[in-house]
Amino acid sequence: MEALKVWSLTATPLKQLLRLSSSSTRLATTIYGRRSYHLSPALRCASAASSSSSSATTAETSKPSGRNRRSASSSNSTSDREAIRSIRLKKVEELRGQGLEPYAYKWEKSHSANQLQEIYKHLANGEESDNEIDCVSIAGRVVARRAFGKLAFLTLRDDSGTIQLYCEKERLSDDQFEQLKQFIDIGDILGASGSMKRTEKGELSICVNSFSILTKSLLPLPDKYHGLTDIDKRYRQRYVDMIANPEVADVFRRRAKIVSEIRKTVESFGYLEVETPVLQGAAGGAEARPFVTFHNSLGRDLYLRIATELHLKRMLVGGFEKVYEIGRIFRNEGISTRHNPEFTTIEMYEAYSDYHSMMDMAELIVTQCSMAVNGKLTIDYQGTEICLERPWRRETMHNLVKEITGINFSELGEDLGNAKDTVLLALQDVLEPKDKSGIRACSSLGHLLNEIFEVVVEPKLVQPTFVLDYPIEISPLAKPHRGNAGLTERFELFICGREMANAFSELTDPVDQRTRLEEQVRQHNAKRAEAVRESPEPNAKKDDDDDESYEVTLDEDFLTALEYGMPPASGMGLGIDRLVMLLTNSASIRDVIAFPVLKLQQ
C-alpha cells in the first residue's frame, strides 16, 4: 500500500515539537483568516482545525518512523504523552473558538472500506470512477499518513478494513491541502467523500473532495512497528490493543460468529432460549466459591450464580422440553490461562433423552462452529494439529486410566488405604509432591480415580475425546449408571487436554437427589471447618484462591421442584470461552474475553 509509513510524535524531540508548534500555528492562523469562511461546512471544519493543529501535526508527521528508529517505549513516556495531549487540546480549543465542534454528532456513510474494495475491484491501475455518479462517503480512524509535494495519503480503518484516501492539491484548494497535511493527526476519526480511483501502483483509493474531523484524538497511538507489546497493558487497555493490533479485534468478531452459530444449531433442533437469575438465594449447580453480595432492601445475602443448571431444570419441571441459556457464570476462584472469574457457557436440557444425545450435540456444535469460522475441521492449536472430524473417541474413565497408567481400578478392592499405596507406588516417578498430597487426601475410591485421571490422564487427551461414566461421589446431579454400580451416566469432553463440556443423564429422583446434595454439603462443611481451624486469623487473606472456607447451602426450592416431577432428561454445559480459544488458536482465556478481570494496577 502506498505511503503506509506512520509519522509518529514519539520520534520527534519535544523541543523541536514546541518550536514547530509555534511557527506552524502562526502560518495556520494566517491561512484561516484569508479563506476559511468560503468553505463548505465539512471543509470549514478541516480548515479551522488546521489553524489550531498545525503545531502538533507537523511535529507528529515531520519524520517518518522506521524499524531502525528508537522504540516508542522510551520516547512515549508520560511527559511526552502529556505534551502531545496538551498540544491536541489546544487544537480543540481553537476549533471551538471558531465556532466549530471537533466532536461531531453524525456522519452519513455510504459504504464501508470492505464494500468499496469489493465494488471497485474492477478498476484498472490509473483508472478513476465517474466523479458525479460514483461519489462515496466513508468514515474511520486515521492509522497512517504521508504528505509530500502536491499529494497526500491517509489510510483510514473502519470496522471492516482499510481504504486509502488520495488527496491531491488540485482537488482541494491550496489552503485546504495545507490544512490537511498540517492538521490531521494519526488516531483522529475522519469522514471523507469523493470518487474512487486505483492508483498507478494499484492501490484502490478515494480521491477526496471533502473531509471533516469527526473525533479529535488527544492521545497518540502506539508506535507502528513496535506496537502495543506490554501484555498487561494490552488487557487493561483493550481498546488500544484493538486499534494497534487488528487481529485482536478479529478474535472478537469470530467469537460473535461462534455464539451465533451455537444459537442457530441448537434452535434448529427446537431448543428455546430462556433467561434465569444471575442473583440467586443459593449458589447451586456446581461446587465452587461464589461471589456474595447483600441486598439492602430485602436484607439478605445473594449470590452471583455459579451455574445455570438448577433453574433450567425448573423449566423442565414447568413443562418445557428443550431449553438452553447462553450466559455469564461467576466463580470467586483462581485466575489462570484457562480460568477467569467471569466466563460464558451454554447450558442446555432436553427432556426424554440421555447423555448419548448430548454427545452427538456436542460434536455437532463444535464442528459447525469450526466450519463457520475456519471453513475446515482440521485446525492448528498452538502448534498441534487437531482433527475435529466426527465421530470422536468415546471411552470410560476407568479404561483411560488403565491405558495411560496401567492401573486397573476394578482390581484395587474396597480398601482405600491400600488403593492409595498402590497408586502412589505405581506413579511415584511421575507425581509431583502436591499431586501426592492430593492423592492422600482423597476420601473415597471414586475421588481417588478422579484425582489420578485429572493429574495424569487429562493432559494427554489432545484429540477430541468423550470421557464417560464418572464416579458417583463426584457427580451429585447425574443419574446412576444403568450397568455399573458406583458410576454415573456422565461424560466430559476434552480437547487439547482441556475440559470443553460436561453432561449427564440428569438425576430426577428427588429422594436420591436430596441425599446426595446433603452428603455434598456435609463433606464440604467438614473441609470448611478444617480450613477455618488451620487459618491463622479468621479474616486473613489466603494464598490459595480455591480454599474450602466458603459456605454451601441446599437449594431447597430446587428439591421441592423435583418432587413435582421432572421428566427423564439429559443436560450439558459447554464453555464458550474455551471453545473460542480452540477455534481462534488463542493461548489464554484473556485473549478471548474483551475485558478480563485483572489484578489491581500497582
From Swiss-Prot:
Its cofactor is Ca(2+). Catalyzes the specific attachment of an amino acid to its cognate tRNA in a 2 step reaction: the amino acid (AA) is first activated by ATP to form AA-AMP and then transferred to the acceptor end of the tRNA. Disruption phenotype: Lethal. In heterozygous plants, aborted ovules. It is found in: Plastid, Chloroplast; Mitochondrion. One of its GO terms (molecular function) is lysine-tRNA ligase activity. It comes from Arabidopsis thaliana (Mouse-ear cress). Disulfide bonds: none annotated. Residues 50-83, 524-550 are annotated as: Disordered. GO terms for biological process: lysyl-tRNA aminoacylation; plant ovule development. The keyword Chloroplast applies. Residues 50-62 have a biased composition (Low complexity). It comes from the Eukaryota. This is Lysine--tRNA ligase, chloroplastic/mitochondrial. Belongs to the class-II aminoacyl-tRNA synthetase family. Residues 136-214 bind DNA. ATP binds at residues 331-333, 339-340, 499-500, 575-578. It catalyses: tRNA(Lys) + L-lysine + ATP = L-lysyl-tRNA(Lys) + AMP + diphosphate. The lineage of its organism: Eukaryota, Viridiplantae, Streptophyta, Embryophyta, Tracheophyta. Ca(2+) binds at residues 492, 499. It holds the Pfam family tRNA_anti-codon.
